[in-house]
A protein has these predicted regions:
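Acidic/histidine-rich catalytic neighborhood
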Residues: 104, 108-167
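Aromatic-rich carbohydrate-recognition surfaces in CAZymes
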Residues: 1-114, 143-144, 151-154, 158, ...
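Acidic/His metal-coordination segments adjacent to aromatic residues that form catalytic metal sites
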Residues: 51-69, 124-139, 276-290
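Non-catalytic C-terminal accessory modules of carbohydrate-active enzymes
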Residues: 260-443
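Beta-strand segments within the central parallel beta-sheet cores of soluble alpha/beta enzyme folds
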Residues: 22-26, 93-103, 121-127, 264-268, ...
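Active-site core of glycosidic bond-cleaving carbohydrate-active enzymes
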Residues: 2-30, 79, 83, 87, ...
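Glycine- and aromatic-rich loop/turn segments at beta-sheet edges
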Residues: 35-50, 113-128, 186-194, 242-244, ...
Length: 444
């Protein structure tokens, strides 16, 4: 599931959100009983997703360690829900499907987090992050940040589906306090994020882990920290690492405007992984062959083109676009991108300028288009038009639900330093949705 939710799903979401929604149905409806059973078998509340599953949702992985320790998979799936909300603002779907998953996976992390009186924060012990070379660690930074993302989304679900979830504000307060209290390791001497408690610089890792905090997790951090993470973890990553590692390093260097380093990592992200005669992706480089037809590697290359050189970021209430041309090319064309019923293509020209072409659609998009600081309205129903820019564009959602707001993810705050009144009374607002009477209960 990690491969699907983190690498494949985000690409499909931008190109065809209807198909993306159908893919989420497997996680929200089909395997509901199995994920409840998985958590109960580990004496943990909420929903716990398997590392790998088939039709039943039961664990089918051939790697027991993944099932036992790589619990970030549960938060990875909730992260896919977060991205779907960013891209579609589909609150009706949230009520019928998403709330139950978002809230019950957050409940899982409420039980998984352990209070540490010495730090007045929460730890997540005995986990393995994406880096499987260093298993069973304390406070893996990727896992902790993903868990915090999940907890904030769970609190948001409690607001959106307030009338269907029998909760008090104190319950949602506790969810937010746990999220903000999760440890986020940062070493001031060196200004970087240790991958886990006790990590020593120079220790080898299997694949990108702490580097993922910048993208795709989009955690707010200092540029210097982002740079140091790339410099520290790049040289110690195993030569047998999958293509996704170097795709994420490419995007990281692009965020820092280090175009030469980005180009080096771009070549490293695909050239060793393609197999002739049809350039099929392999899980490993030539000297370390792995699974053939490795779709996750191909998907990560699309991340590099769409989110890296295309510069696209999905965030709460907006899509940010900061495009640039890939090295050795004269044009970058992404034929279809969707954001809240606004369908468009993106083309980057040789001089670095770009064009957003709105495609004719039967409904009026509820967005504002800001290009190089100038605001534009989308063209009318069933009408195509183009917008030109030089530096960046932002598509902003108009008329978002003001009654429920997804709070920004923040961690590493002592409980004593947190404001206890973090949740306000919220209602669903004026939007009309069906009442599915979701069977959600809360027990820490």
């Amino acid at each position: 599931m990690w491969d699907f939710d983190m690498w494949i799903f985000p690409v499909i979401l931008l190109t065809d959100p209807i198909v993306a929604r159908e893919m989420l149905t497997y996680r929200t409806r089909i395997i509901r009983r199995a994920v409840q059973s998985n958590a109960a078998s580990n004496n943990i509340g909420g929903w716990q997703y398997p590392w790998a599953s088939a039709f039943t949702g039961r664990e089918v992985t051939s790697t027991p360690g993944a099932a036992e320790l790589q619990h970030h998979i549960t938060a990875d799936i909730a992260f896919a829900i977060r991205l779907y909300l960013y891209a579609t603002d589909n609150l009706s779907w949230m009520v019928t499907d998403g709330c139950e998953l978002a809230f019950n996976t957050a409940r899982f992390w409420m039980r998984r987090a352990v209070y540490n009186s010495a730090t007045d924060k929460y730890d997540i012990p005995t986990v393995t992050g994406p880096d499987t070379m260093n298993p069973n660690v304390l406070n893996n930074v990727f896992t902790n940040v993903m868990a915090a993302h999940n907890l904030f989304l769970g609190e948001y679900a409690g607001c959106v589906c307030e009338s269907f979830i029998n909760l008090k504000n104190e319950d949602l307060n506790e969810m937010i306090r746990t999220a903000r209290g999760l440890r986020l390791l940062h070493e001031s001497n060196g200004d970087f994020n240790p991958q886990f408690e006790g990590y020593v610089v120079g220790r080898q890792i299997a694949q990108a882990d702490a580097v993922l905090l910048a993208y795709p997790l989009d955690l707010e951090m200092e540029q210097s920290t982002k740079r140091n993470n790339l410099n520290i973890y790049g040289p110690v990553t195993s030569a047998s690492s999958s293509a996704m590692t170097w795709s994420m390093h490419t995007i990281g260097w692009l965020e820092l405007d280090e175009l030469t380093l980005a180009a080096d990592n771009l070549r490293r992200s695909y050239q060793p992984y393609l197999r002739s005669p049809f350039n099929v992706w392999n899980q490993g480089p030539v000297e370390f062959p792995g699974a053939p037809n490795y779709v996750s590697g191909a998907a990560s290359f699309l991340h590099t083109m769409i989110n890296g050189y295309g510069g696209i970021r999905l965030r709460d209430g907006e899509m940010v676009i900061r495009p640039r041309l890939p090295p050795g090319t004269t044009r970058l064309s992404i034929p279809t991108i969707n954001f809240n019923r606004f369908r468009f293509s993106l083309e980057v020209q040789q001089d670095g300028s770009f064009t957003i072409r709105q495609q004719a659609i039967p409904t009026m998009p509820t967005i504002q288009i800001i290009i190089d600081g100038v605001s534009h309205e989308p063209c009318g129903i069933n009408t195509a038009c183009a917008f030109h820019g030089i530096n960046s564009a932002t598509l902003k959602l108009v008329g978002a639900n003001a009654n429920c707001q997804l709070k920004p993810t923040e961690l590493n705050i002592r409980l004593a330093d947190q404001n206890h009144a973090v949740v306000t009374s919220c209602t669903y607002g004026d939007r009309s949705v069906a009442d599915p009477k979701l069977p959600i209960e809360y027990n820490r």
